[in-house]
């Protein structure tokens, strides 16, 4: 028996020359929707065919698109987008097909907006308010929801004809979280868009979230029971990156030194970094884990594996709080970002369309014939990328999810292994 489709197209409307043109499921060849925690805009690729009036030949870009679909559980997805490219267009008689490459309308506005002005006048302004009120709502005039987490530090700077998203990425490395972290909270924010809107939040803040979904490798739903919407059944995981040691040595992730020269007062300072001191103090997704043995080789007095020099001019941003330690903040935020993406895992499944980039999941996987918990790869992860794809030939939507974790060691258990035996939940 053919499995039930988990994709139902509710609406697909493209504005062409001021008129709305509706497309049905019969016109849809493929659809790919992408969210990325490193990107300020969602993307969608829509491949269409038209055998009636060849309307696709009239597309030239900048057409508004509204799409709405749901899965077999009634979970709804809808988005307003803008066409910025048409690829693979084929015209043959009355038939036409092509792929509409779409993004958020704000991304188009961002590319056409370049601003030179001072932000945070009068002694500085908290960075979260600059991002939300001055840039996203003020410059872009976005209608999207904005989750801008509070920052501890105020800031003032001059934008040298930057686009709005460039400004936000510039400010992200200088932002220190106000709440939700610890006294050792690190500077460094992530800025991204998901289906719910814009997000500007500290890397540390992800550690405060509880997991929303359980990704279990080899899971089979018990017979005659209603499916648990929190559980995502996964056949296998692909460990893409697992803390490249050689790269870590080259970029100074374990032991490094930064030497700075400030044009403002000709001041010279050195900042030392050691993974032992930093790793123990920074909030992490999996809390205290058993670190790999090679970490012992990078003790406090180890010679730096990378020495970096930097010339700065703090006269450009002397207003606000915490600006006197700006160079230290920049170095710290860079290291926090690298730690955040320390390990990369990919999974694929068919089903729930609700997971969003930035949400927390718990991954449980097993090893060996005895199906013991794989402590090296199980644990808490953040969803870093989502790629959903519908193909008309199989009438199914699959989801590829990229997960990241900042924990370099082994976990002791997951909620699933505490609540159930491996024999009860896996094949």
Give the residues covered by each predicted segment.
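Polar/acidic, low-complexity leader/linker segments enriched in S/T/G and N/D
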Residues: 1-32, 76-77, 420-425
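Envelope-exposed proteins and targeting segments
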Residues: 10, 42, 63, 77-79, ...
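Short conserved beta-strand and strand-loop elements enriched in small hydrophobics
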Residues: 11-15, 63-72, 358-371
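Short beta-strand and beta-hairpin "edge-sheet" elements
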Residues: 25-26, 70-102, 365, 369-401
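An acidic/polar, Gly/Ser/Thr-rich interaction patch typically located in mid-to-C-terminal regions
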Residues: 33-58, 221-427
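Solvent-exposed coil/turn segments that connect beta secondary-structure elements
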Residues: 49-51, 70-72, 82-90, 103-108, ...
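Surface-exposed cap/loop segments at beta↔alpha junctions
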Residues: 53-145, 156-157, 172, 176
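Short beta-strand-centered interaction patches in the first periplasmic/extracellular domains
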Residues: 97, 147-247
